[in-house]
Amino acid sequence: MNKLRQSFRRKKDVYVPEASRPHQWQTDEEGVRTGKCSFPVKYLGHVEVDESRGMHICEDAVKRLKAERKFFKGFFGKTGKKAVKAVLWVSADGLRVVDEKTKDLIVDQTIEKVSFCAPDRNFDRAFSYICRDGTTRRWICHCFMAVKDTGERLSHAVGCAFAACLERKQKREKECGVTATFDASRTTFTREGSFRVTTATEQAEREEIMKQMQDAKKAETDKIVVGSSVAPGNTAPSPSSPTSPTSDATTSLEMNNPHAIPRRHAPIEQLARQGSFRGFPALSQKMSPFKRQLSLRINELPSTMQRKTDFPIKNAVPEVEGEAESISSLCSQITNAFSTPEDPFSSAPMTKPVTVVAPQSPTFQANGTDSAFHVLAKPAHTALAPVAMPVRETNPWAHAPDAANKEIAATCSGTEWGQSSGAASPGLFQAGHRRTPSEADRWLEEVSKSVRAQQPQASAAPLQPVLQPPPPTAISQPASPFQGNAFLTSQPVPVGVVPALQPAFVPAQSYPVANGMPYPAPNVPVVGITPSQMVANVFGTAGHPQAAHPHQSPSLVRQQTFPHYEASSATTSPFFKPPAQHLNGSAAFNGVDDGRLASADRHTEVPTGTCPVDPFEAQWAALENKSKQRTNPSPTNPFSSDLQKTFEIEL
C-alpha cells in the first residue's frame, strides 16, 4: 500500500548543487550579453535600507518583506498581499521585472545604479539587490524569490551583467580616445578626445565620413600628382570639388587626431557673398564693438569706456599755464569746486563757532581826500525792480561769464569768491596756482585800460546830487518799490538801500543768477584811480551792487549819516548793512546776531561832524555784515561759514 501511495505522488527532482551545474551558468553569461537571459520569479517588493552593500542588509530586507506577507495573509485571510509572479530579465543594460500576467513593467533598473547583489543564506531561492533610487536618492533593496532556480544562479547572472557593462564602458572610453597628459613645465592638464557616447547611428555615420575623407585624400593626392606634371600653377582646388578648404582642414585634423569627429560645414557656394549685399558702415567705425571678426571684448564696449572715463576729477581746480585764464574764471572754478548747493551736515546739532573779526586794512584815499563810508537811507527817487524770486541755495557763479565780459567778471568775482568759499584758505589758492606778481600787474593793467577806454561814454551821464532823506512814511512801507540796482531778498521787509549816486562810472551789463534774478554788475569809478585803488575797488564792491559808489569823487561825498533799518533789529549801525540776501539760507554770521559788530553807541545816530571812517575797513565790515546775513553756518555744518579774505595786493 505504501508503495502504491508513493507511486501516485509526484516525484521530486534530485537536488543538484549550483557548483555542479557550470554548463547552465555559461548559458546564462551568453544570454546576458545577448539580452535573452530571463528567470521566473516572485517579486516580494522593495524596502529602504541604510547601507549600500552587505549580505546582512539584503537578508534583513527579505525577512521584513516575508513578515509583512504573513501579517496581511493572517489578517485578511486569503485576500492578503501576495508576491507578484513576474519574469526577471537580466542584460548588460539593466534589470527589468515584467508582470507575468499583465506584462506590465514593474521595475526597470539600470545596471550602473546597482551597488550590490547577493543570494540569501536563510532562503535558498531568495535573491536581492541594492540600488540607488533616482528620484529620492535613497538606498532601496529589491527582493525576489526564484521559482525554478536558486538565488545563487540569479546573483551569478547579475554579476555577469556587471562584467558586460564594465567591458562596454571600457570599450567606449577607448573609442572616444580621451587621454589626459600633465605638463610639468606649465603645470596644466591637457585632455584629448571627447567623453560623448556615440550611438550606433552616429558610429555608422562616422565610419561613412571617415571613408569619404580617405577617398577625398586619395583623390587630392592623385590630382596634385597630375597637376604638378601638367601645370604647376593649376593646383588650387575649385570650390565645388571635394578638395575644398573644408576637406583640407578635416584631413589635417584626421592626421593629427584620428578619433576626432569633424564638424559639419556649409558649402562654399552658400557662404559666397552676393553682389547686392550691403554692409553696415556705421559698425566699422573705431568705437564699434563689431570692428573685428572676434569675440566681443567687454572692456572695449563704448558704454564701458564711457563709464571708465566719466569719473569726477580729484583736483577740480586745474593748474594755471601762462595767461590763458583770467582771475575771474579761476575764482569761478574754485567757487564751483568748494561750494555745495545743499548742506550735508543736517543730522546732529553742534556748537556755534566763534566770531571772525574782519582784518585791518590801510587807510584808503580817493584823489587825496579821505572818503567817508556812511550808511545812507533809502532814496526818494526809486525805480521799479524786477519781481523777487524765491532765493534758492544755489551758487551765483555756477554759470561763469563768457570771454567777452572777462573784465566785468574779474571785477565782480573777487569779493563773492572770498565770501562763498569758506572751506578754502588763501594758502590753498596760492599753492594750487603758481601766481606771479607780473600776472597780477598785467591783469590790473587790462582792467585799467578797459575802464579808461569806456570813460568817454560814461562821462556823458548826468551827475545827480545827493538824494534827500525820505519822509518817515517811506520807512514804514514794507512793500514800497526798491532801487533798480538793489539785490532784492525774498522777504518783504524794509531794508536800507544806498542812494543812486551816479558819478562818472563804467556802465556794465548785468547777468542773470541761477535763481532767476538779474544780478547787476558793479559800478567802477574812473576818476583818476591808482592800481591799488582799483584792487580795493574791485574786491570791496564786487559783491555789493547795493553799495553803488563807496569811493566817490570829493565833490560828491557828503559827510552825512542816515539811520539804517533792518528787519531783525531796530538799532542803527554806522556801517553799511546790505539786505539779508544769503545763499545758504542763514541770516547770521557764525551764530552772532545782527548788530553785535556795531559800535557801542548803537542806539544813537552818528553825528555829522564825526571822524571819517576808514573806507577799506568799512568795506570789510560790510563784507562781514553781508556774510552775517547770508553765510550763517548751519548748526551741524562746520564748513558752511564761507567768509574769507581772498588776497590783498600792495603796490
UniProtKB/Swiss-Prot annotation:
Molecular function terms from GO: alpha-catenin binding; beta-catenin binding; cadherin binding
Compartments annotated for it: namely: Cell membrane; Endosome membrane
Compositionally biased region (Low complexity): 235-252, 453-466
User: Mind telling me which InterPro entries this protein's record contains?
Assistant: Numb/numb-like, Numb_domain, PH-like_dom_sf, PTB/PI_dom
Question: Keywords of this protein's UniProt record, alphabetized?
Answer: Cell membrane, Developmental protein, Endosome, Membrane, Neurogenesis, Phosphoprotein, Ubl conjugation
Q: Which GO terms describe its cellular component?
A: apical part of cell; basolateral plasma membrane; clathrin-coated pit; clathrin-coated vesicle; cytoplasm; cytoplasmic vesicle; early endosome; endosome membrane
Cystines in this chain: none
Lipid bilayer topology: Peripheral membrane protein
Question: Which residue intervals are annotated with compositional bias (Polar residues) in the record?
Answer: 630-644
| UniProt keyword annotation of Ubl conjugation present | yes
- Residues bearing the modification Phosphothreonine: T102, T243, T436
Location of region: Disordered: 228-255, 419-483, 623-651
Q: What does this protein do?
A: Regulates clathrin-mediated receptor endocytosis. Plays a role in the process of neurogenesis. Required throughout embryonic neurogenesis to maintain neural progenitor cells, also called radial glial cells (RGCs), by allowing their daughter cells to choose progenitor over neuronal cell fate. Not required for the proliferation of neural progenitor cells before the onset of neurogenesis. Also involved postnatally in the subventricular zone (SVZ) neurogenesis by regulating SVZ neuroblasts survival and ependymal wall integrity. May also mediate local repair of brain ventricular wall damage.
Q: Entry's PANTHER family? A: NUMB, PROTEIN NUMB HOMOLOG
Protein name (Swiss-Prot/TrEMBL): Protein numb homolog
The protein's gene is named NUMB
